[in-house]
């Protein structure tokens, strides 16, 4: 659902800008949509509340939570956190700054740039849908390896920029390749840590992912202001290359345990 909304957003905003002289209508449409979603949640709140409670598991989870910080003493956990930090940082940076790079840095028409941003987010959605079709046929580590390598190639095409079309295709490749990475990394957590630390590790990983999305996209913006928007390409290449290095290190550690 996230990917679908992110795909439709640029298309809706482009259509509104072409039909109206004010960008405020776009935010108005978004506000009304979010209000309707909130209203629907309120109306159906009783259906979302489960009546079944599992008391024994609750106490067990609380016991593990008191030892949650012990998880941070494991080097493999810190490597996993950095891996999530880099992944969401690269995803967010490409999603937030590629449009500015294309329109302001490379004089691409706004409508065309918006179309390819929708392709990027749509590719991420398609990638996650395809994950369900291939996950049983491929080893998770092999799938992650291929996807991360594809993100490196995609970001390299954005940096290289022989033509606008190849840059657009690089962005699309990044979107499709990024789709399976987050859910695959989450599902592979039990292989990296022992059973009693899985829940806590996943929580830390999601927190690191949120931090990465905010921090790295902000850093990219600062660099773009001080250097140029063209810094986006090498920035993404560095992030994705570090992702690959970390993933291979984590895999070797897991196989050695």
For each predicted feature, which ranges?
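Juxtamembrane intracellular "pre-TM" segments in multi-pass secondary transporters
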Residues: 52-80
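Intracellular juxtamembrane helix-capping segments at the cytosolic ends
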Residues: 180-194
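A late C-terminal transmembrane helix in Major Facilitator Superfamily
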Residues: 193-229, 236
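A membrane-interface helix-boundary motif in multi-pass transporters
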Residues: 15-32, 219-240
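Extracytoplasmic gate region of multi-pass secondary transporters
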Residues: 73-118, 122-126
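Structural signature of the two symmetry-related core transmembrane helices
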Residues: 142-157
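Helix-to-loop junctions at the C-terminal end of transmembrane segments
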Residues: 127-140, 224-225
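Helix-loop-helix hairpin linking two adjacent transmembrane segments in secondary transporters
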Residues: 1-50
